[in-house]
Design a protein with these regions (language model features):
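Peripheral, non-catalytic segments that deliver or gate enzyme domains
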Residues: 2-302
Length: 302
């Protein structure tokens, strides 16, 4: 007897949008429940080869790639209580090892991967929140610690700058942003809209161009999430004025950093647009109506 189509639809395997390595876009990772639980998978697009990376009883939902595409990383908790460690493994397979050797088991408070094995990891324990910076597979150094919430936001393409969310002002729901220079491991700039307003690093994060320290952020001071471009080193913020009625996220940058891929959410539907940062022109992209969990721009601009 054939299973009803509605059951087939609910039981069909799901997967996240594959994420590619910036320096090797033929190496990708995604998370899928094909095996019966959510696990991280690696995809060698050139060889048309897929491989399940993680195999944890309670599942794994967070994974990524080092920028050069040589290593897969994922967060694995030992007991299903969300306390665990980031692990890493060669893209082709092999033994899994801690991403940062001296990072204690903790709740994850964000992760950012940079060039030449650079890693910034956020840790949350009963003793507070911290951010550690080090090398993949090696040791690390504590950059920041506080009793209030902190979460890693992103690393610049060249690894010079790190942005974190923090709640030093005591409001976890409305965080502020702080930028650090990683040489010499010191605060660079702060961005806060005041009490009751939050700032967040957008999905797109930093510009994909090395040497460009601009980061896409979201602000809610208008009553809806709206994008802005923050340049911590220059001390400059540009709020992007958009004639759109709903909330807007920045999904990605175009490879030359001259345009942004926007996701506009309104009336239960998501719409993709391309915003030219030079002219301000907003172009609606053609796609099917529905909800968009994630979108990206490939290195060739597709």
């Amino acid at each position: 007897m054939t299973e009803p189509r509605w059951k087939q639809r609910y039981r069909a395997p799901s997967l996240t949008l594959p994420r590619w390595a910036p320096d090797d876009p033929e190496h990708l990772v995604y998370v899928s429940n094909l095996s019966g639980s959510w696990q991280v998978h690696a995809w060698d697009r050139a060889a048309d080869r897929h491989r399940q990376v993680s195999d944890h009883p309670t599942g794994v939902v967070a994974g990524g790639l080092t920028p050069d595409g040589t290593r897969v990383v994922w967060f694995e908790d030992s007991k299903g209580d969300e306390v665990g460690r980031w692990l890493q493994q060669p893209f082709e397979g092999g033994e899994a090892a801690p991403l940062v050797a001296d990072a204690e088991p903790a709740w994850s408070a964000g992760l950012a991967l940079g060039p030449k094995g650079l890693v910034a990891v956020g840790l949350a324990t009963r003793d507070g929140f911290s951010v550690r910076v080090g090398e993949v597979g090696g040791g690390s150094e504590e950059l920041y610690r506080h009793d209030e919430m902190v979460d890693v936001g992103g690393l610049s393409r060249d690894g010079r700058l790190l942005v974190v969310h923090h709640a030093e002002h005591g409001d976890n729901l409305h965080p502020a942003l702080r930028a650090f220079e990683l040489e010499p491991m010191a605060p660079l700039a702060d961005l806060w809209d005041g009490e009751g307003f939050g700032l967040f690093v957008a999905s797109a994060g930093f510009s994909p161009v090395a040497g460009d320290g601009r980061v896409a952020v979201l602000a809610d001071r208008s009553g809806r999430l709206r994008p802005a471009i923050w340049d911590p080193a220059a001390g400059r913020r540009v709020d992007l004025e958009l004639a759109l009625p709903g909330e807007v996220d920045v999904a990605d940058w175009w490879p030359d950093a001259e345009a942004l891929l926007l996701v506009h959410t309104y009336m239960g539907r998501d719409e993709l647009s391309r915003l030219d940062l030079r002219s301000g022109a907003l172009e609606r992209l053609d796609h099917r109506a529905g909800s968009i969990q994630r979108a990206g721009v490939r290195p060739d601009g597709a």
